[in-house]
């Protein structure tokens, strides 16, 4: 049975026809520069608890997180206190996946912007159960897996090291090889990420929790999808008669690219009648698989600043005059038009290598037009704030 005290807060989440209590469900929220501890405590005391506060580990030290952030559930707090070195990796991973999110959405109206001095990191935009929230939960979970697995292989953590199962001989399409080197222990990264990240969602049984759990799993599995076999050849003149191989994670960009494609193909769902799973909102679409991102609510258009939706708007954003894609001025500026400014850029050019060990370049100036989206009319902006 779904938790009744979390009903009716989010009219945008639909449920399949059925019993009356399977109505609407609430939504969940989720880097900032270093700030003093008293301010952090005041900030946290005034912030709703329903968020992914662990995202803020990228901005604060592990000790402060463990002791003072109320958004962590007991299991997360226990893991944080027991494995402070892993929390350090989680913090570094948070910075990495946020950068990747911003790279993937750099040409979109919503550009994965973060809020300074806000431990929810993304603000109210994560309250809506949108495809943007689906992407953020997936890539954040993937980021934890990636960061912990990498730290294991680099010998930075007490609890793990290289994959202990990759020993002896094995075979691939090229023939037999010996396991050697240091295979990335991705299964440990997945297990810890699941235990830590999913802990909060498992405390409740509502629609948003199920959505988050599903998308968290998509993110974890995305990292594993891009494990690659790397080998070193042995033999006369490197003839590769013998090979030593190990499993290594690919660059995190591949995971980001993959999840971006999943974002574009995300499937809108509604809760089934007994509240234990999903069904597609539109019967003309296929059912979601374990590798699909799912969401409940349509996204706002992100055209104008809307504090209630967490939208910063697109006024002042740089756009591409000739593009017909999401970075094009027509799409990015939502039909409001754009301003053009001529600017002079200084770049390095005519670079030459000088013996030994120096590259010398000239500085060249060129003039380019920069197009930025116009602000909405005052009345239009006031309607959204």
UniProtKB/Swiss-Prot annotation:
GO MF annotation list: cytokine activity; frizzled binding
Domain of life of the native organism: Eukaryota
UniProt note on tissues of expression: Detected at the marginal tip of the developing retina. Expressed in the intermediate and the lateral plate mesoderm in the presumptive chick forelimb region. Expressed in the eye, head ectoderm, prospective forelimb mesenchyme, lung bud, pharyngeal arches, the brain and otic vesicle.
Subcellular compartments: Secreted, Extracellular space, Extracellular matrix; Secreted
Keyword Protein transport belongs to the record: no
Lipid-modified residues, O-palmitoleoyl serine kind: 237
PROSITE patterns listed in its UniProt record: WNT1 (PS00246)
Keywords: Developmental protein, Disulfide bond, Extracellular matrix, Glycoprotein, Lipoprotein, Secreted, Signal, Wnt signaling pathway
A Gene Ontology biological process term: regulation of fibroblast growth factor production
Disulfide bond positions: 101-112, 152-160, 162-182, 231-245, 233-240, 303-334, 319-329, 333-373, 349-364, 351-361, 356-357
Keyword Secreted on entry: yes
Gene3D superfamilies according to UniProt: 3.30.2460.20
InterPro entries: Wnt, Wnt2, Wnt_C, Wnt_CS
Annotated signal sequence range: 1-20
Predominant location category: secreted
PTM notes: Palmitoleoylation is required for efficient binding to frizzled receptors. Depalmitoleoylation leads to Wnt signaling pathway inhibition.
GO cellular component terms, A-Z: extracellular space
Sugar-modified residues: 111
Function: Ligand for members of the frizzled family of seven transmembrane receptors. Functions in the canonical Wnt/beta-catenin signaling pathway. Acts as an upstream regulator of FGF10 in the lateral plate mesoderm during limb initiation in the embryo.
Family as reported in the entry's similarity comment: Belongs to the Wnt family.
Assembly behavior: Interacts with FZD4 and FZD5.
Record protein name field: Protein Wnt-2b
Record organism: Gallus gallus (Chicken)
């Amino acid at each position: 049975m779904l938790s009744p005290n979390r009903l009716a807060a989010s009219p945008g989440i639909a449920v399949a026809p059925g019993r009356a209590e399977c109505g609407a469900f609430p939504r969940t929220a989720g880097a900032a520069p270093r700030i003093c501890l008293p301010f952090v405590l005041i900030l946290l005391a005034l912030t709703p608890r329903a968020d992914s506060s662990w995202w803020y580990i990228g901005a604060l030290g592990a000790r402060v997180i463990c002791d003072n952030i109320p958004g962590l559930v007991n299991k997360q707090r226990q893991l944080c206190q027991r494995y402070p070195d892993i929390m350090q990796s989680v913090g570094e991973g948070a910075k990495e996946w946020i950068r990747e999110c911003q790279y993937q959405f750099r040409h979109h109206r919503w550009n994965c912007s973060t809020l300074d001095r806000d431990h929810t990191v993304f603000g109210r935009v994560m309250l809506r159960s949108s495809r943007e929230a689906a992407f953020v939960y997936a890539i954040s979970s993937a980021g934890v897996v990636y960061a912990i697995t990498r730290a294991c292989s680099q010998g930075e953590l007490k609890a793990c090291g290289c994959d202990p199962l990759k020993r002896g001989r094995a075979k691939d399409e090229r023939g037999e090889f010996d396991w050697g080197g240091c295979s990335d222990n991705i299964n440990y990264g997945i297990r810890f990420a699941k235990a830590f990240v999913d802990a909060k969602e498992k405390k409740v049984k509502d629609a948003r929790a199920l959505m988050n759990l599903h998308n968290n799993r998509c993110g974890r599995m995305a990292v594993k999808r891009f494990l690659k076999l790397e080998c070193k050849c042995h033999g006369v003149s490197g003839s590769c008669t013998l090979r030593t191989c190990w499993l290594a994670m690919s660059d995190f960009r591949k995971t980001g690219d993959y999840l971006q494609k999943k974002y574009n193909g995300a499937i809108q769902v509604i809760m089934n009648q007994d509240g234990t799973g999903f069904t597609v909102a539109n019967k003309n679409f296929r059912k979601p698989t374990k590798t699909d991102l799912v969401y409940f609510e349509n996204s706002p258009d992100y055209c104008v600043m809307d504090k209630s939706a967490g939208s910063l708007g697109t006024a002042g954003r740089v756009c591409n005059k000739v593009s017909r894609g999401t970075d094009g001025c027509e799409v990015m500026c939502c039909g409001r038009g754009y301003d053009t400014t001529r600017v002079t850029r200084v770049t390095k050019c005519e670079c030459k290598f000088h013996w030994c060990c120096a590259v010398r370049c000239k500085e060249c100036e060129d003039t380019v037009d920069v197009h930025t989206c116009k602000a909405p009319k005052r009345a239009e902006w006031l309607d959204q704030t």
